[in-house]
């Protein structure tokens, strides 16, 4: 656990009481700090172009196949840079033949290239995080009783009080578990699953007291309440039972329910509470706090790396929770959060496993592939904030350094997957017909997984079992899982979600957990 992170568990009633204490004016203290720079995304984007000496960027492809600049979906044109960087060759040309050479030499080289050119570096001066449990509640997920905790991780802002960062996380575990349980941390909204409601008698008292208070503030409300005697300011949250129409299919339960029913827990962490998902927010959030409200430098971290840092801080808390099996915590996300989940698993070796959903460019997709989403998609004003500023160089058509493209990248996504080895890495996609767009390049992501296989094998893990060269390897059929090794692949028949693969992920991961598989990494 990061020894800079201080963990605190406080009674939620004390927190509520403190909220009632008048705040001490801090205007005089804060006036000595320069205010954060207020850039639009376009202004911040231009600022980075100026720093890099970029005069013009190539336009990214359109997802509309009828547009003049539509993305390529012709496989014969998809591999303009067919030869990938070899993850098992050192920068000096020497081959990596042992695990020791990988851990001590090659892996650090890949990490350096990834940090400098693609995702950005973690600053050395990131403030500490203090976790507080705001609510502990006994609830139900489906028909399973659970213990749910709502937490906030406050980032120390004493170095720059003008920016506040409070990480939102919810942790839910089965109430009747016999011991600590595996937990899947999921990027998404942090909400309690089904908060316990007061009985009707108590709810009536709450409403009566609330009506009295409202009438005291505004006497005219008395007549309104008398006109509508059945109205309650706080309605019951108990949902009425709705019978299912005969003949309609039974809907699949949500992923969180599937996890709980299999004896797992989950933690929902809100990325927006860590770093905003836009370029205008780069002088705010954790990136802005560390930079004291100033714009980024070219190798500073982007939002994907910031979200992954927040997930690691969430893991700091989970390591202190006796209900959590902290040695078996995974990370999950879909789409942009699938990118973040893969980045998290690659850089934070304490995570035992990852479910990487529909991650596309910047995630599992090979950047060197000319198919759908491209490097240029991530260098424009809409998505550049996910990456390090330096990544914009690879979309440049005119610059002081000339021009660069995806073929100039020192690394590619197969090496990001390789950084996860030998830990459990499950690559998940759906099908275009159901909404998991061709844009994501399912084939290119599969090729990346195949190209990462040698690293898994070198480190004593089992790979996908694909023997073909990554250049010619073809995806297995839909709903055909490659689930025998620590590196796994499955394309389900649903849309832009990993929900249909969650039950397969759990069974696959349980196999290794039950076998007491311990990845041989420096973290262990």
Segments from the language model and where they lie:
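Conserved strand-to-loop "acid loop" that flanks and positions the catalytic carboxylate
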Residues: 421-441, 492-494
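Short beta-strand element of the alpha/beta-hydrolase
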Residues: 168-170, 179-189
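Mobile cap/lid helix-loop segments that gate and shape the active-site cleft of serine hydrolases
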Residues: 244, 286-290, 297, 353-416, ...
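C-terminal catalytic histidine-bearing segment of alpha/beta-hydrolase fold enzymes
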Residues: 432-433, 450-524
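Glycine-rich nucleophile elbow surrounding the catalytic serine of serine-hydrolase chemistry
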Residues: 333-345
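Cap/lid segment of the alpha/beta-hydrolase catalytic domain
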Residues: 185-320, 360-370
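Alpha/beta-hydrolase fold nucleophile elbow
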Residues: 323-335
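N-terminal pre-domain segments of enzymes
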Residues: 29-122, 508, 518-524
């Amino acid at each position: 656990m990061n020894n800079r992170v201080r963990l605190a568990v406080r009674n939620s009633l004390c927190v509520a009481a403190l909220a009632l204490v008048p705040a001490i004016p801090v205007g005089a203290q804060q006036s000595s700090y320069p205010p954060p720079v207020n850039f639009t995304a376009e202004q911040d984007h231009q600022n980075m172009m100026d720093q890099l000496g970029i005069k013009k960027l190539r336009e990214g492809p359109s997802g509309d196949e009828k547009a003049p600049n539509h993305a390529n979906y012709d496989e014969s044109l998809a591999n303009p840079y067919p030869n990938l960087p070899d993850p098992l060759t050192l920068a000096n040309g020497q081959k990596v033949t042992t695990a020791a050479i990988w851990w001590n030499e090659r892996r650090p080289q890949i990490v350096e290239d990834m940090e400098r050119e693609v995702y950005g570096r973690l600053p050395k001066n990131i403030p500490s995080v203090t976790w507080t449990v705001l609510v502990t509640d006994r609830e139900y997920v489906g028909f399973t009783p659970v213990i749910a905790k709502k937490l906030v991780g406050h980032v120390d802002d004493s170095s720059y009080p003008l920016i506040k960062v409070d990480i939102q996380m919810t942790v839910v575990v089965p109430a009747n578990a016999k011991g600590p349980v595996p937990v899947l941390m999921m990027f998404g909204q942090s909400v309690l699953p089904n908060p316990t409601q007061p009985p009707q008698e108590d709810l009536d008292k709450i409403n009566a007291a609330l009506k009295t208070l409202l009438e005291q503030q505004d006497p005219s409300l008395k007549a309104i309440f008398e006109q509508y005697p059945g109205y309650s300011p706080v309605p019951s949250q108990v949902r009425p039972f709705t019978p299912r129409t005969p003949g309609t299919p039974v809907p699949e339960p949500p992923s969180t329910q599937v996890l709980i029913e299999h004896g797992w827990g989950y933690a929902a962490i809100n990325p927006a509470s860590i770093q905003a998902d836009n370029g205008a927010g780069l002088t705010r959030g954790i990136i802005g706090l560390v930079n004291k409200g100033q714009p980024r430098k070219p190798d500073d971290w982007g939002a994907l790396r910031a979200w992954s840092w927040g997930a690691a801080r969430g893991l700091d808390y989970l390591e202190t929770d006796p209900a959590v099996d902290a040695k078996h915590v995974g990370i999950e996300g879909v789409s942009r959060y699938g990118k973040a989940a893969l980045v998290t698993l690659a850089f934070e070796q304490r995570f035992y496993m990852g479910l990487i959903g529909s991650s596309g460019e910047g995630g599992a997709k090979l950047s060197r592939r000319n198919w759908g989403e491209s490097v240029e998609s991530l260098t424009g004003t809409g998505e550049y904030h996910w990456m390090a500023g330096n990544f914009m160089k690879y979309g440049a058509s005119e610059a002081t350094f000339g021009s660069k493209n995806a073929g100039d990248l020192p690394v590619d996504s197969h090496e990001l997957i390789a950084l996860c080895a030998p830990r459990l890495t499950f690559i998940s996609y759906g099908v275009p017909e159901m909404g998991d767009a061709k844009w994501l390049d399912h084939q290119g992501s599969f090729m990346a997984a195949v190209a990462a296989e040698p690293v898994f094998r070198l480190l004593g893990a089992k790979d996908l079992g694909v023997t073909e060269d990554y250049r010619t390897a073809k995806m297995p059929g839909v709903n055909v899982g490659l689930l025998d090794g620590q590196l796994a692949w499955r394309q389900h028949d649903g849309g832009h979600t990993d929900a249909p693969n969650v039950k397969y992920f759990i069974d696959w991961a349980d196999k290794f957990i039950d076998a007491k598989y311990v990845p041989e990494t420096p973290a262990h």
